[in-house]
């Protein structure tokens, strides 16, 4: 359903943001 799609997009976005933050932290 539509909510499932939103949840999937939210998880993907959160995962991407978390991955990006981890990269920034690892560079320091």
UniProtKB/Swiss-Prot annotation:
Highest taxon of source: Eukaryota
Localization in the cell: Secreted
GO biological process, one term: defense response
Record GO cellular component, one term: extracellular region
Expressing tissues: Expressed by the skin glands.
Keywords: Amphibian defense peptide, Antimicrobial, Secreted
Keyword Phosphoprotein on entry: no
Keyword Transferase: no
Sequence similarity: Belongs to the frog skin active peptide (FSAP) family. Cruzioseptin subfamily.
Function: Has antimicrobial activity.
The protein's name: Cruzioseptin-10
Source organism per UniProt: Cruziohyla calcarifer (Splendid leaf frog)
């Amino acid at each position: 359903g539509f909510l499932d799609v939103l949840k999937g997009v939210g998880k993907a976005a959160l995962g991407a943001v978390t991955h990006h933050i981890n990269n920034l932290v690892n560079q320091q």
